[in-house]
Each structure stands twice: as C-alpha cells, then as structure tokens.
From Swiss-Prot:
Protein's job: Catalyzes the prenylation of para-hydroxybenzoate (PHB) with an all-trans polyprenyl group. Mediates the second step in the final reaction sequence of ubiquinone-8 (UQ-8) biosynthesis, which is the condensation of the polyisoprenoid side chain with PHB, generating the first membrane-bound Q intermediate 3-octaprenyl-4-hydroxybenzoate.
Name assigned to this protein: 4-hydroxybenzoate octaprenyltransferase
Keyword Cell membrane part of the UniProt annotation: yes
Organism for this UniProt entry: Burkholderia pseudomallei (strain 668)
Catalytic activity: all-trans-octaprenyl diphosphate + 4-hydroxybenzoate = 4-hydroxy-3-(all-trans-octaprenyl)benzoate + diphosphate
Residue intervals passing through the bilayer: 30-50, 92-112, 133-153, 158-178, 207-227, 232-252, 266-286
Compartment(s) where it occurs, according to its Swiss-Prot or TrEMBL record: Cell inner membrane
Length: 287
C-alpha cells in the first residue's frame, strides 16, 4: 500500500495544485463577502480543506470516467489509472473516501450548507460524463468549481442571496474561459476520440469566445463592486484581473499549445488578485 501511495497522489493531482487554487479563490471571495470581511477562521479552514479534498475526489472520478479516452491523448496517456498502474476500483474508493471526509468537515455547519453539499457532490461526480453529451461541458465545470460560493453564503448567513448566484454565474464564465484555453491544448486528440469540448464547439471563434467570457465575468464583478460600494482596493484588484485577461489574449491568440496551457495556469493569478482586492477592501475598511 505504501508503495502505491505516490500513484494515489498523482491520481488526485497533488503534484498539480492549480485546479485546487481555481476552486479556492471564488470560495474565499464568497466567504469574505458573506462575512463582511471577517470570516471565522474555522470556516476558512473547513472550506479550504474541503476544496482540496473535493477537487482531489473529482480528479479520481474524472480519470475513472475518461480511462478509455485518456490513453489516446498524449498528455494523459501516462496517468496512473489510464496506464494500468491503478485499478478502476481503487480510483472509485479514493473518490468516495475523500468525499466522505469532506462531508465530515461540514457536519458542524447548518442544515442548508449540508443540503447544498449534496448538490455539489452530484455536480462534481457527473461532470466527467457531461463531456459525452454537452457541447460546452466547461459551463457545467464552472458550476462544479463554483458551488463553494452558495455554500459559503449558506454557512455564514444561512441563506443564499442573489449576489451569491451572480458570483456563481461569473464563475461559470470564468471556467469556460480558462478551461477552453486548456481544451485548446488537446483539441486535435479530442477530435479523434469524439470528446466534446468548448474548444471544439467554438472552433475558429475560440479566442473570441474566451475573451467574451472574461468580459462577462469581469462585468459581473463590476456590478458586484458597485452594489456593495467597494472602495479603491477592490477596483485595483479588479483592474489587475482585467490586465491578466488581456495578457492571456497575447498567449492564446496564435493557438500554440504550450502558450494556451500557460494561459490556463496563469488564471491562478487572475483569481488571486481579485481576491486580494476584496480582502484589502475589507481590511482597510475603505468606503
């Protein structure tokens, strides 16, 4: 078992934290806004650890669902499950175990948060299979990656206000943007095996679609900042995030694989500076 531990870590992408960070930033945004900038440390710990665990569970489920496809894609052919180093039942057992630990984390929280967690698990578990049916499965991914937003509001306020759903919508647009750039890396392989992705659906309009999704996401955050009367630290963070999106355009415009992958990874900075703006606004109490 100990000898297989490194394989399990690779299965759940512990060597690639970018996915966890892309989940974490929107969740932290929601925690800070829901609590007026003063979230309980215990809540921050619960949601941060829960984000890591559920992302890891999602990776295991994704590799199980895609095991017959991944062997035909150069980038994924050597994943532990695809290459036969881990059995299918092991991936399922790991995913279930991580999901159960995540649920144990939220046991001290209110009933609404627990109810929403059931929806979150369902969305996370079904996302990998959406790539067979939906033309833009990245939108479904945005819901899965952003469900920490309504859960955070539920945990703090015991309700999910409209602003939480607006933030979830923004996360859907953001996910379509960064995951389309990611899908551009594998587009040729995905076309051969019949996988459906937004990069394939958008076709020659892929770069335009990505930039429009960035614009929609940033536009929602303009509305959010105005509605909550945020001060200059927030807008500085927003401007930095907008700058990141422009930088991403310079990376993806020629559709070069490694540059598209770099744009995907750089979204960590976009999410980070936006959260920094929110946190700084509350920390400095600027109105």
């Amino acid at each position: 078992m100990l000898a297989r531990f490194p394989l399990y870590l690779r299965l759940i992408r512990m060597d690639k934290p970018i996915g966890s960070l892309l989940l974490l930033w929107p969740t932290l945004n929601a925690l800070w806004i829901a609590s007026d900038g003063h979230p309980a440390p215990s809540l921050v710990a619960i949601f941060a650890l829960g984000t890591l665990l559920m992302r890891s569970a999602g990776c295991a489920i994704n590799d199980y669902a895609d095991r017959d496809f991944d062997r035909h894609v150069k980038r994924t052919a050597e994943r532990p499950l695809t290459s036969g180093k881990i059995r299918a039942w092991e991936a399922i057992a790991i995913a279930v175990g991580l999901a159960l630990v995540s649920f144990l984390l939220i046991l001290p929280l209110n009933g609404l948060t627990k109810e929403l967690s059931v929806v979150a698990v369902f969305v996370a578990a079904t996302y990998p299979f959406m790539k067979r049916f939906f033309a833009i499965p990245q939108a479904y991914l945005g819901i899965a990656f952003g469900f920490g937003i309504p859960m955070a509001f539920a945990a703090v306020q015991d309700t999910v206000p409209m602003i939480a759903w607006a933030m979830l919508a923004a996360n859907v647009f953001w996910s379509v943007a960064y995951d389309t750039a990611y899908a551009m890396v594998d587009r040729d392989d995905d076309l051969k095996i019949g996988m459906r992705t937004s990069a394939i659906t958008f076709g020659r309009h892929d770069v335009l679609a990505i930039m429009l999704c960035y614009a929609a996401m940033l536009g929602i955050y303009v509305w959010l900042g105005a509605a909550l009367h945020f001060g200059w630290p927030y807008w500085a963070g927003w401007a930095a995030a907008a700058g990141c999106s422009i930088y991403h355009y310079t990376l993806i415009k020629d559709r070069e694989r490694m540059a598209c992958f770099a744009a995907f990874r750089h979204n960590n900075w976009l999410g980070g500076v936006l959260f920094a703006g929110i946190a700084a606004h509350y920390a400095l109490a600027v109105r």
